Swiss-Prot record:
Protein name stated in the entry: Glucose-6-phosphate isomerase
Gene: GPI
NCBIfam families referenced in this protein's UniProt entry, alphabetically: PRK00179.1 (NF001211)
GO process annotations (BP): gluconeogenesis; glucose 6-phosphate metabolic process; glycolytic process
Residues the record lists as N6-(2-hydroxyisobutyryl)lysine modifications: 34
Pathway in which this enzyme or protein is active: Carbohydrate degradation; glycolysis; D-glyceraldehyde 3-phosphate and glycerone phosphate from D-glucose: step 2/4
Modification type N-acetylalanine: residues: 2
Length: 558
């Protein structure tokens, strides 16, 4: 594929931006088109609620949207989409298919990898998960002293942690009959130590989530958990009742003491950051119940079908992707804020920080050449309204343009005080996108200060600080209620957005070589931290840091 910057459709878009980009003014666009909302919004109607994507508060015209859709066609988005769904090995650096869509393929149509339908294997693992969940949640599965399981501890890192953690937090209202869940990921001993102090070994079930069963952080934490458990249980055979594995390495799992019957498999065509739909989601299913886990899969499958079959100009993931391309590659925006107005979604931005940045944080194209344009943005965010009292100042009046996605459910899980809390939340959600779009003109600010009785001197002094330029772009994503189905649909929507952007940039969104170099160097440094001998084998900075750490290790601290 030709480089993006040499694509005639992209050059046409850039030319339009150079000639007209500075003239785009959201206030004027809304004044000129009273139907702008209808022209630039999309409603997705499912049997489990609706999703409204309002992208009218973006710096776009109908011409811009047409050019963006033409760019998607020119870059081969439709053909690439089919290649993914058909099980072709689009992860070309690792020679793997990319089939998280198969994990939630509720229509059960055949999906082939190397000529073999993967769906029987997918369904077999789902059936095994269902049976296991029913045994644990019903109390049929007992610990070594005969107690039922009250706590499930997922030990994993990256994709084996962020997805299940985000989902179990988001679906807390659906967990009333399930065990508590805990997530341990960090190699920092504080994480496992603090967690274990709150647990009873007799009623704890550990899930060790590691495809290879060799991930250093995960296996170190798992061994620490096993050591803690055996201090109480004494008998190593008791491990089988309290530890299960999400892995493909039967030998290592057996060596650890886990019964291979309690090993849940997944496949090399499941990328870590797309794995919550697989056996990696076992902690989700245990916490909220397998029926709700299936609803999560069904919501994602609904979005998969929408993404695969809907024309690009009405396709929610495609539109989100194209708007991102517009801001990153024409306006030069470097970050993207995800701002969910729902406390249950407090890990949503962190989840897609990995989903987006590990997928599209690349500078090498499929042909092995360096890109000459920007790729993946820095993704960040916090729940509303907390963020309003933290970083929105910079979004409103800072020197950087930060495109934002605002998300909110119409119905709350907690309509306390006759819905007062949620009404205030909704009002703030609506006010922020209007404020970012409209801003406040000099005349409006002056009238406001005059009405407040400010003296002419105070008025002139304060006036420039009270002006908001506005013209800050946002998407509003409003959905009926945060149910398992709806969460599945929202997550899949953003997954496909990331995929589309990767295709347009001609990068591989499904490998992560960038995490390897640091791990290699850490293995070399680890033995150098032993003893007190000065280290001189690195650059001056790294040597200095190692030697300072060695010197301070035994220092007495008051």
């Amino acid at each position: 594929m030709a480089a993006l910057t040499r694509d005639p459709q992209f050059q046409k878009l850039q030319q339009w931006y150079r000639e007209h980009g500075s003239e785009l003014n959201l206030r004027r666009l809304f004044d000129a088109d009273k139907d702008r909302f209808n022209h630039f919004s999309l409603t997705l109607n499912t049997n489990h609620g609706h999703i409204l994507l309002d992208y009218s508060k973006n710096l776009v015209t109908e011409d811009v949207m047409r050019m963006l859709v033409d760019l998607a066609k020119s870059r081969g988005v439709e053909a690439a989409r089919e290649r993914m769904f058909n099980g072709e090995k689009i992860n070309y650096t690792e020679g793997r298919a990319v089939l998280h869509v198969a994990l939630r393929n509720r229509s059960n149509t055949p999906i082939l990898v190397d000529g073999k339908d993967v769906m029987p294997e997918v369904n077999k693992v789902l059936d095994k998960m269902k049976s296991f969940c029913q045994r644990v949640r019903s109390g049929d599965w007992k610990g070594y002293t005969g107690k039922t399981i009250t706590d499930v501890i997922n030990i994993g890192i990256g994709g084996s942690d962020l997805g299940p953690l985000m989902v179990t937090e988001a679906l807390k209202p659906y967990s009333s009959e399930g065990p508590r869940v805990w997530y341990v990921s960090n190699i920092d001993g504080t994480h496992i130590a603090k967690t274990l102090t709150q647990l009873n070994p007799e009623s704890s079930l550990f899930i060790i989530a590691s495809k290879t069963f060799t991930t250093q952080e995960t296996i170190t934490n798992a061994e620490t958990a096993k050591e803690w458990f055996l201090q109480a249980a004494k008998d190593p055979s008791a491990v089988a009742k309290h530890f299960v594995a999400l892995s493909t390495n039967t030998t290592k799992v057996k060596e650890f003491g886990i019964d291979p019957q309690n090993m849940f498999e997944f496949w090399d065509w499941v990328g870590g950051r797309y794995s919550l739909w697989s056996a990696i989601g076992l902690s989700i299913a245990l916490h909220v119940g397998f029926d709700n886990f299936e609803q999560l899969l069904s919501g994602a499958h609904w979005m998969d079908q929408h993404f695969r079959t809907t024309p690009l100009e009405k396709n929610a993931p495609v539109l989100l992707a194209l708007l991102g391309i517009w801001y990153i590659n024409c306006f030069g925006c470097e970050t993207h804020a995800m701002l969910p107005y729902d406390q249950y979604l407090h890990r949503f931005a962190a989840y897609f920080q990995q989903g987006d940045m590990e997928s599209n944080g690349k500078y090498i194209t499929k042909s092995g050449t360096r890109v000459d344009h920007q790729t993946g943005p820095i993704v960040w965010g916090e729940p509303g309204t907390n963020g309003q009292h933290a970083f929105y100042q910079l979004i409103h009046q800072g020197t950087k343009m930060i495109p934002c996605d605002f998300l909110i459910p119409v119905q709350t899980q907690h309509p306390i005080r006759k819905g007062l809390h949620h009404k205030i939340l909704l009002a703030n959600f609506l006010a922020q996108t209007e404020a970012l779009m409209r801003g406040k003109s000099t005349d409006e600010a002056r009238k406001e200060l005059q009405a407040a009785g400010k003296s002419p001197e105070d008025l002139e002094r304060l006036l420039p600080h009270k002006v908001f330029e506005g013209n800050r772009p946002t998407n509003s994503i409003v959905f009926t209620k945060l149910t398992p189905f709806m969460l599945g649909a929202l997550v899949a929507m953003y997954e496909h957005k990331i995929f589309v952007q990767g295709i347009i940039w001609d990068i591989n969104s499904f490998d992560q070589w960038g995490v390897e170099l640091g791990k290699q160097l850490a293995k070399k440094i680890e033995p150098e931290l032993d003893g007190s001998a000065q280290v001189t084998s690195h650059d001056a900075s790294t040597n200095g840091l190692i030697n300072f750490i060695k010197q301070q290790r035994e220092a007495r601290v008051q």
